[in-house]
Amino acid sequence: CIRDSVKPETVKMFEGFGVFTEAELKSRAEIKYEAYSKAINIEAKTMIDMAGKEIIPAIISYTTELANSVLSVKEAGADASVQADILTEVSGYLKEMKAASAKLAETVATAATFEGKAQAEYFRDTVKVAMDELRAPVDKAEMIVDKEFWPFPSYSELLFEV
């Protein structure tokens, strides 16, 4: 949409009606690109912060308790395969989160090397993809991790309990 605002036919129309000049349209487009980049940058840095300071530590606590549960159940002579399977699954999500968080931090740092339209496109094409890659294992873990460990309200709590 921003890109279309500076197309020759759009510029001609706005200039023809005396609404905006080409320079004004280009200036407005640059401002919109900058605002978009700033918004995505804030969202990405917030995701990195939430993952690193809240979600990953919570999952580490949960997997530690789950591992202790597996050992206790085995010591009691019972089958701990379900707990062990959950531990393996959640540990896998934890590993994915750690890698995705590092990748997101790297892409955010790289985004700072661009400006204007190029930066906005980098945020759209690269940073948002990295954000989705972090969100995927977090969403999966949220469905499994005990709510006593989860640091934020779940989607269902937000949807049905507010």
Predicted regions and their residues:
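Short, small-residue-biased leader/transition segments that mark boundaries at the very start
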Residues: 1-2
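C-terminal catalytic subdomain
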Residues: 8, 17-86
